[in-house]
UniProtKB/Swiss-Prot annotation:
Protein name: Octanoyltransferase
Described function: Catalyzes the transfer of endogenously produced octanoic acid from octanoyl-acyl-carrier-protein onto the lipoyl domains of lipoate-dependent enzymes. Lipoyl-ACP can also act as a substrate although octanoyl-ACP is likely to be the physiological substrate.
List of residues binding substrate: R70, G71, G72, Q73, V74, T75, Y76, H77, S137, L138, G139, G150, L151, A152
The keyword Manganese is assigned to this record: no
Marked site positions, Lowers pKa of active site Cys: K134
Length: 218
């Protein structure tokens, strides 16, 4: 199972049921369980990471705030943003946490390069940036040697809710998205490229695609 990856497309979902399903998957997986990547668009929500501080919630208005157990601080999820959750057995892949963070950042950088968008990681703030503007947020959690949570890549969305917070705890952090930089507006195209780059970076030999997932709507 080391080189098998299951990719699940969940469509548009509320945050909490997916969060709960990630926990259940991680708690019940064993050494034979294949790694999975879940691709999803969330309904509008602010999520506070474990390092989140209330003062970074400026004016959340009618958008709910959910406490999450991922790393990092506050961010926004909404339609038009590609969220990818990485349910990977790090021990089996012989990856450290820092290795995984670097792999995910390179995954996004390579994906954007396919659309002639030059981007880079920053040593002081996880994520991926284009000329100082943030295009991808990153937050992970490790349990029993396995990762969950993942990345949020802005593709073709309403960015204005980011003005209601200090994204990832940075006051005035400017956000940008793929469609503004000449890339596709279609999330499905970006998903395909992202999965292709992930398979290349982590050496999966067998990839199975699914639109089904055990995610119960609340």
């Amino acid at each position: 199972m080391q080189n098998q990856l299951v990719v699940k497309r969940l469509g548009r979902r509320d945050y909490l049921p997916v969060w709960q399903a990630m926990h259940e998957f991680t708690d019940t997986r064993n050494e034979e369980t294949p790694d999975e990547v879940w691709l999803v668009e969330h309904n509008p929500v602010f999520t506070q990471g474990q390092a989140g501080k209330a003062e970074h919630l400026l004016n959340t208005g009618d958008i709910p705030v959910v406490q999450s157990d991922r790393g990092g601080q506050v961010t926004y999820h909404g339609p038009g943003q590609l969220v990818a959750y990485f349910l990977i057995n790090l021990r089996r892949k012989k990856l450290g946490v820092r290795d995984l963070v670097t792999t995910i950042e390179n995954l996004v950088i390579n994906t954007l390069k396919a659309y002639n968008i030059d981007s880079a990681a920053r040593p002081d703030a996880p994520g991926v940036y284009v000329e100082g503007r943030k295009i991808c947020s990153l937050g992970l959690r490790i349990r029993k040697g396995c990762s969950f949570h993942g990345l949020a890549l802005n593709v073709n969305m309403d960015l204005s809710p980011f003005l209601r917070i200090n994204p990832c705890g940075y006051q005035g952090m400017e956000m940008v998205q793929v469609s503004e930089l000449g890339g596709p507006k279609d999330i499905a195209l970006v998903e395909q490229q992202l999965v292709k780059e992930l398979v290349n970076l982590l050496g999966y030999e067998q990839v199975e695609f699914s639109t089904e997932a055990e995610v119960r709507e609340a």
